[in-house]
Structure formats: C-alpha cells, structure tokens
A protein has these predicted regions:
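ATP-binding N-terminal substructure of ATP-dependent carboxylate-amine bond-forming enzymes
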Residues: 1-105
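Conserved metal-phosphate-binding beta-hairpin within the catalytic cores
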Residues: 251-288
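Phosphate-binding site of ATP-dependent enzymes
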Residues: 172-253, 264-265, 269-271
C-alpha cells in the first residue's frame, strides 16, 4: 500500500496550477494537496484540502520562509504551478531538498533558462540539429526592418521572454513592424511557420515525460486552438507524424518530469516554436485522457516505481469559465485554510 503523499502546488490558482490539482485529484493516489499562492484572492486556496500563503519568490528572505513552510506542513513533493516560480525553485532545488526533505519537481537552471527565452530556444534547436523557425535579434528598429524586408511579410515580432502570447505579433508590413517594435520588450524576429486560426488546424501542444531513471514516456500529442494565450479547443489523438521529432527534442533536453513542446505541423514536417520544462496548462486534459503527468511524477520520484506505458485515449476537450462560490464572508476576512469554496453542478 502506498503511503500518503503531501504535495504543495505553487501558483495553484493559475491555469497550470489548477491543472496539477485536478490531475492529482483523479490520479487515485493517496495525495493531500496543499495549495499555495501569493495572495488570498485565488480560487485554489479555497478548493484544496489545505492552503497557505507564500511570499513572492523575489522577496527578501523568501527561500528561508518557503523552506520553513515546507517543514511546518510536512511537504513531500513540490510541484510548480506558476511559471514565475520556476527559475527560483530550479536554482534553489538542491538547497530546498536538503533543508526541507521535500522533492522539488523542476528542471535544471540551464534548461529553464533556455525554455524561458524564445531566442535561446531557437538557438538550442538549431545547435542540436532539430527543426526550428529561423530567428534574429535586431540591434534596433531599423535593423529589424531591414531583416523583415529581406525575409518578406508576414513575420513574427515577439518578446524573448513572455507568456500567454503577450507581446507576440504577426506583422504584415514594415509600417506595422516599426510601430510595434518600440512597444515590444526584448524584441526578436522569427520567420512565420503558419498563421494560427480559430479552428483546429496545424498547431499542436505536446509532451514527453522523463522519469527519475531518464526513461522517456510518451509522447502525448494534441491539436489545439488558442484563446488569450490558452489552449481552448483541444483534440487529443495519436498524431504519429509528431512522435519521432518530439522524442528527438526530448532526447536533447536535460530535464525531469514534463517537457512541453508547442509546434506547427507543416509540409516540411513538425517545427517547434516553444519549449516549456514544466507542467502545462492542459495538464488536466492530458490526465483525463490517460497521460497524467503529476501522477507519473509522484510514482517515479516519490514512490520510486517503474511507470507503465500509459494508454492514452482520443477525444476532444473544450474550455469554459466556472465560478468558485464562498458563502458568508467579506473581502477583509477571507482566510485561506479556513474558508472553503464550492462549485455548483449546474452546467
């Protein structure tokens, strides 16, 4: 019989954090979820078994406070639900584990740095002989215009660092490029692979899981549409044309747990444009269809079991909005860990 595992999820109210919690709930494993976030107005704090506020990772003394919380709450495993926390837990992983006894599911600092920087991602793919979309770092707007004119429009102007499609533009003319360039932090140019659409087309969200022993599980493949930077309609199927390139990418990356790959499938084959060495916003969808990465992380890193090959079913997921309702409380008195929210079965 497996022993109870206490899992702390950072950023538990974010899209990724919610996905981790949902996946743990359907895993069938003996798990107690301790939801954390930096502010009390966060839904996961009122839906998990336990909840606690943690400091921003960039705050002075955050490391000592977080280690103390892990000790106080007897945490066995830490899962990162906020991408803003990932660099911190990656850089401090060894110290956190040695001081608290908790296992931190986070890739190496170098891998996190590559995944966080879209320019470094393109460079990594190129250097490893993997498919990629050509990218360029302009010195200024005039230089950007010169390269864009040579490549031809449309092209992609985007920030090197960013999430949820913020500061990502498909630029159709030189005038548009020169207008948007000053508004784009850490700008880079990239050749356009394909134009995203509102229907299921050529864009995919995929994953390969790597166990504690370095064995690769998967890949998981799904086609998607995107709304507000989030996967909105998701078609899960065994898109076999993606399997070989995904395993090649995973084999080149130094990571543990989940590696998410966003890519386009073109006439030239699969071309990745983003890597994320963390759990995904579609974690719950993957778990439902049989590819439960938080469960695999616990089985491999905590329970130290050999993982079976998951049987992934096909299907479609559609996102929608939901409310968490907390009765008889005011803003100035709401307290994580004391108040509980409910979700009505009305839809």
């Amino acid at each position: 019989m497996r022993r109870q595992c206490r899992v702390l999820v950072t950023g538990a109210g974010s899209g990724v954090g919610q996905g981790i919690v949902k996946a743990l709930r359907v895993s069938g494993l003996p798990v107690t979820v301790v939801a954390t976030d930096i502010a009390p107005m966060n839904v996961a704090l009122y839906r998990a078994e336990e909840a606690v506020l943690i400091p921003r990772v960039e705050a002075s003394g955050a490391l000592d406070v977080i280690v103390r919380l892990l000790q106080q709450h007897k945490i066995d495993v830490v899962m990162i639900g906020s991408e803003f926390d990932l660099s911190f837990f990656s850089a401090n992983r060894q110290e956190i584990e040695s001081r608290s006894g908790a296992i931190v599911i986070a890739a190496s600092p170098r891998t996190v740095a590559i995944a966080d920087d879209k320019w470094l991602t393109a460079e990594f793919l190129c250097e490893n002989g993997l498919p990629y979309a050509e990218a360029y770092l302009p010195s200024d707007a005039a230089d950007a215009g010169r390269i864009a004119d040579a490549w031809g429009y449309p092209i992609v102007l985007k920030t090197r660092r960013g999430t949820s499609s913020r500061h990502v533009y498909i630029v159709k003319s030189r005038d548009e490029l020169l207008r948007l360039y000053p508004e784009t932090p850490m700008p880079m140019l990239q050749r356009l692979i394909d134009i995203p659409t509102s229907h299921l087309g050529s864009e995919y969200t995929c994953s390969v899981f790597k166990t504690a022993a370095g064995r690769m599980i998967g890949p998981f493949t799904a086609r998607r549409t995107v709304r507000g930077g989030t996967s909105w309609h998701i078609e899960v199927a065994a898109f076999e044309a993606l399997h070989a390139p995904l395993l090649a990418i995973a084999g080149a990356v130094d990571y543990i747990g989940s590696l998410n790959v966003q890519l386009m499938l073109t006439e030239q084959g699969a071309i990745p444009f983003e890597l994320n060495a963390r759990f995904s916003g579609t974690t719950a969808v993957r778990a439902h269809f049989g590819f439960n990465e938080p469960a695999m992380a616990l089985l491999s890193f905590f329970y130290k079991e050999e993982l079976p090959t998951p049987e992934v079913r096909s299907g479609i997921a559609m996102r929608y909005y939901e409310e968490v309702l907390i009765e008889d409380v005011r803003m100035d008195s709401i307290t994580p860990g004391q108040h509980k929210g409910k979700v009505n079965p009305w839809f």
